[in-house]
Amino acid sequence: MATRRKDARPDEIRAAALALFAERGFAATRLDDVARRAGIAKGTIYLYFPTKEDLFRALVRQDLLPNLAALEQAAAAHPGPAPARLRDLLATMAARMGAPTAAIPRLILAESGNFPALARFYAEEVVARGLALLASVIAAGVAAGEFRPVDPAAVAPLAVAPLVMTLLGRNAIGRHVPATPGPDDLLATHLDLLLRGLAP
């Protein structure tokens, strides 16, 4: 039992950190707070994560990047034409923005000015890889004549930007603007506009 508990500690610490980062923000959360939330002694957390930045990097690598890898695999295995691949990819991205790990991009957007090294890490590990995935699907569509000739690298950030804005709006002012369409309606409208704009 003790061995299982010890093996589970990194997962428990990351879960506690994610919850606290979402509640308080990165800057306002201390490692001691995370240790208390995880139910471990203050000193124990430093055996696993010497700094708060190390803990954040572990969150990205252990909890976020596997989701991105799954998206890459699903896109590569998708049997449909490029428009269907792009639609399904963006729909899956949008669905995952409701998961607890959606707190991570929110943190980066909110606090990147104070933590440039973490912002750079996130940009290199997550953003660049996600944009490359989108660009590859768009490029395949252009090559197959399923999309009109466009620069995939220019279209990729435009394809995902409305999803990011919806995520931010939902957690900031969205609840104060009751007339705003729901996430599903916004996604459907975005996909319709995007795919019509890419049509040959």
Residue ranges and their predicted role:
Residues 72-103, 153-159:
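Hydrophobic alpha-helical connector segments
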Residues 96, 103, 107, 117-143, ...:
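Amphipathic alpha-helical packing segments from all-alpha helical-bundle domains
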Residues 13, 28, 51-57, 66, ...:
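Short amphipathic alpha-helical segment with a characteristic S/N-K-E followed by hydrophobic residues
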Residues 61-79, 171-179:
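Short, flexible, glycine-rich and Lys/Arg-enriched loop motifs at helix boundaries
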